[in-house]
């Protein structure tokens, strides 16, 4: 299932919406200058996790691994709600570290690294700041060719391994299965089923799939969780789209040209219309982006427009970087070069909207009119969402079914039971209790594929014992070396997780496991104890 998360304008990144959190603390409650934060002291590490998610088992396993290796006490600390954990993170009252991670918004190494570790980034919860790291990201952003950018990203990750403001744990696969009625089912680079390609021999050819109730209206600029996003990706089409492997393909755009990664000219293909017959023009994008960026509109996806000139987090301001040339052409000026800007334009925050959206955004969000391969027929809250093929769709995705009906669930156990009974055609997850057996139960109908999803520990580097000094680096490296990732992935997750080699994900173009310094991810009890002893010689934990 996809855990929904509502965030503020400067809030948690979209890609992290599915994650629980954990805390490692060496400070007593109320001690030091940080004040009364979460965690326990007297040399004990607390591993906090949100107990409204499936995190208890792995948290216990990590505690056990670290405690055994370092000879210290590390205990799980359940926190009732994800929102409570999130509040403590944003207020920086966690006395140590917490689990974090990233699920890619779009297939770019830059999306992982900028969002989570660049100085001042909205999801930089460790409060990490490194001029060397930031400069390498800037060089990558200004690179004229992808290979040069990949080289800078590799160097940037090497700096992260030297500092360890975060500790990568594992990559998560997309896993699930399909019914005896279904065929041609596959998952893409984000572990999302490729719904339009799926077929069903039942239900009149309509494919039944699981989803959870979207947490917000289905307005592209106001959606920040996976459930609503999946519907939007079927009802709308953007300037570009991503194929199953994350490669970029022009969709509504005929061309997106730049000579400096800062100034872009975007030309649209003629003939595109929304499902109500109104034309898709340059204004459809310009108006939608300006609406999404305006502070007073309080759109949850507003941060996607922060790179465009004129954006402000503090007051209403026009996106002056958007200029209409003619009905099929507009230009974009960014505040600074961004080599992944074109890649980002396939995200649903950048989808076009017709004029009707701005006349009554609330009504539009309840039943959006899009330009994608499907149109929304009905949304029966907490029950189902019905989509039918859109005959006006002019893009490159082939619809192989008679429609998609999302059944809205609150439990993966119910999803899996319905899958076994052929009551749904596609399930995009299974309960943790079924992980050891689902591939055997489903046989060739089981799916288990890598996804653009990484999990790790994020360390607040401003807190005592964890700062950006010799002691803090040694402690983080000791913990990193003390976690037996392979054992946890094998024994708890049965091949649905893979030990991490970096801070991104293998399904993203440009990924490499050859990053200098990533040997610190190797389980090495002796080296872990040596590093912890070095930190203890500086300051007793």
Can you name each region flagged by the protein language model?
Residues 359-365, 392-437, 452:
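Ligand-site clamp/hinge motif
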Residues 28-30, 53-57, 181-182, 188-191, ...:
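Structural transition elements
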């Amino acid at each position: 299932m996809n855990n929904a998360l509502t965030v503020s304008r400067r809030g948690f990144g979209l890609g992290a919406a599915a994650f629980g959190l954990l805390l490692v603390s060496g400070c007593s409650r109320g001690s030091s200058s940080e004040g009364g934060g979460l965690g326990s002291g007297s040399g004990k590490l607390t591993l906090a996790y949100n107990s409204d998610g499936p995190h208890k088992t792995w948290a216990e396993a990590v505690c056990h691994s670290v405690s055994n290796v370092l000879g210290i006490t590390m205990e799980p600390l359940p926190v009732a709600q994800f929102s409570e954990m999130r509040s403590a993170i944003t207020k920086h009252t966690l006395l140590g570290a917490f689990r974090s991670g990233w699920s890619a918004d779009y297939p770019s190494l830059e999306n992982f690294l900028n969002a989570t570790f660049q100085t001042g980034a909205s999801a930089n919860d460790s409060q990490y700041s490194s001029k060397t790291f930031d400069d390498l990201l800037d060089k990558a952003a200004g690179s004229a060719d992808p290979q040069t950018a990949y080289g800078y990203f590799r160097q940037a990750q090497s700096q992260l391994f030297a500092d360890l403001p975060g500790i990568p744990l594992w990559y998560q696969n997309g896993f699930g299965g399909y019914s005896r009625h279904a065929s041609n089912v596959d998952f893409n680079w984000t572990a999302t089923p490729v719904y339009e390609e799926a077929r069903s021999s039942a239900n009149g050819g309509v494919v039944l799939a699981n989803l959870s109730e979207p947490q917000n209206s289905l307005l592209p600029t106001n959606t920040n969780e996976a459930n609503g996003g999946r519907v939007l990706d079927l009802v709308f089409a953007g300037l570009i789209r991503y194929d199953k492997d994350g490669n970029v393909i022009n969709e509504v755009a005929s061309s997106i040209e730049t000579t400096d990664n800062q100034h872009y000219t975007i030309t649209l293909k003629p003939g595109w219309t929304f499902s109500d017959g109104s034309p898709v023009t340059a204004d459809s994008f310009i108006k939608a982006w300006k609406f999404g960026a305006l502070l007073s509109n309080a759109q949850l996806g507003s941060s996607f427009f922060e790179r465009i000139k004129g954006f402000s987090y503090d007051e209403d301001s026009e996106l002056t970087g958007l200029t209409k040339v003619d009905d099929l052409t507009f230009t974009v000026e960014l505040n600074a070069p961004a080599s992944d800007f074109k890649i980002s334009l396939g995200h649903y925050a950048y989808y076009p909207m017709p004029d009707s959206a701005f006349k009554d955004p609330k009504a539009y969000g309840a039943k959006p009119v899009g330009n994608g391969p499907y149109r929304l027929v009905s949304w029966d809250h907490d029950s189902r969402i019905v989509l039918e093929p859109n005959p006006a769709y002019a893009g490159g995705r082939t619809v192989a079914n008679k429609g998609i009906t999302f059944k809205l669930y609150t439990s993966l156990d119910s999803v899996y039971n319905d899958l076994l009974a052929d009551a749904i055609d596609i399930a995009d997850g299974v309960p943790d209790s079924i992980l050891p057996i689902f591939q055997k139960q489903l046989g060739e109908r089981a799916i288990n594929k890598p996804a653009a999803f990484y999990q790790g520990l994020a360390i607040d580097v401003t807190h005592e014992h964890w700062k950006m000094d010799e002691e803090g680096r040694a402690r983080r490296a000791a913990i990193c070396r003390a976690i037996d990732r392979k054992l946890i992935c094998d024994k708890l997750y049965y091949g649905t997780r893979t030990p991490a080699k970096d801070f991104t994900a293998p399904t993203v173009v440009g990924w490499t496991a050859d990053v200098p310094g990533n040997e610190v991810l190797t389980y090495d009890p002796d080296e872990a104890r040596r590093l912890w002893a070095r930190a203890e010689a500086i300051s007793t934990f």
